[in-house]
């Protein structure tokens, strides 16, 4: 089985400039997702999609491949779907493509591999990392703030509410297009909150 991990790590960031190469502990942020992908017992190839020379150097030093991202795919308005689709190499027939964000440095390779096993065993089109975060949240309708709950309850009594973490999106390769990585048969994979730090 051929499983490709793609790590999108562009140079620009509105929130934190050069965030992917900033040190977190002893290593640049992007190091952690590359390390997990390379250490996975299921991922066969790792590609970093970047327009950053420092990220390119880090990736190559670690043994990952680099896909140089064109300027038109490095802007703030570009969807991740288009970036991932652009980075998929055609030198192999891929079974799965995994998007791994550098902004989830606390994810463990054990959790990643368990999720891959679950996606394959369950024959899912897409598996998305998430945390269970049942909070008393509010939304907006017609300009008014309204509660997203019917009754105020303690957190442990609230129904599950899963929030995507961005740590990974595991997709069957044949459903990945320029506009989506989400198929019909979709599930979320609950990861520990400590592994969802962004």
Language-model features, listed with the residues they occupy:
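Short beta-strand scaffold positions
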Residues: 49-50, 170
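N-terminal glycine-rich phosphate-binding loop and ensuing alpha1 helix
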Residues: 2-49
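Short phosphate-binding loop-to-helix
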Residues: 53-98, 107-114
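Conserved core of the sugar-phosphate nucleotidyltransferase
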Residues: 82, 86, 105-192
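Active-site acidic Asp-centered loop
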Residues: 100-102
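Extended, histidine- and acidic-residue-enriched regions that form the cofactor-binding/catalytic faces
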Residues: 93, 194-197
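Short, high-confidence coil segments that cap the C-terminus of an alpha-helix
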Residues: 43, 92-94, 123-124
């Amino acid at each position: 089985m051929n499983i490709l991990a793609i790590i999108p790590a562009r140079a620009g960031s509105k929130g934190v400039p050069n965030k992917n190469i900033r040190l977190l502990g002893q290593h640049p942020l992007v190091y952690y997702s590359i390390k997990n992908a390379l250490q996975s017992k299921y991922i066969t190839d790792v590609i970093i999609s970047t327009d950053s020379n420092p990220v390119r150097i880090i990736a190559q030093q670690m043994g990952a491949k680099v896909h140089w991202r064109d300027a038109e795919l490095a802007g703030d308005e570009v969807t991740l779907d288009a970036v991932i689709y652009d980075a998929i190499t055609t030198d192999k027939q891929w079974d799965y493509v995994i998007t791994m964000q550098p902004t989830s440095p606390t994810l463990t390779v054990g959790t990643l591999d368990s999720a891959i096993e679950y996606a394959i065993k369950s024959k899912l089109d897409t598996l998305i990392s998430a945390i269970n975060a049942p909070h008393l949240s509010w939304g907006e309708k017609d300009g008014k703030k309204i509660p997203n709950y019917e009754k105020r309850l303690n957190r442990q009594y609230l129904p599950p509410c899963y929030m995507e973490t961005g740590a990974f999106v595991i997709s069957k390769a044949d459903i990945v297009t320029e506009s989506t990585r989400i198929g019909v048969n979709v599930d979320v994979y609950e990861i520990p909150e400590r592994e969802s730090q962004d």
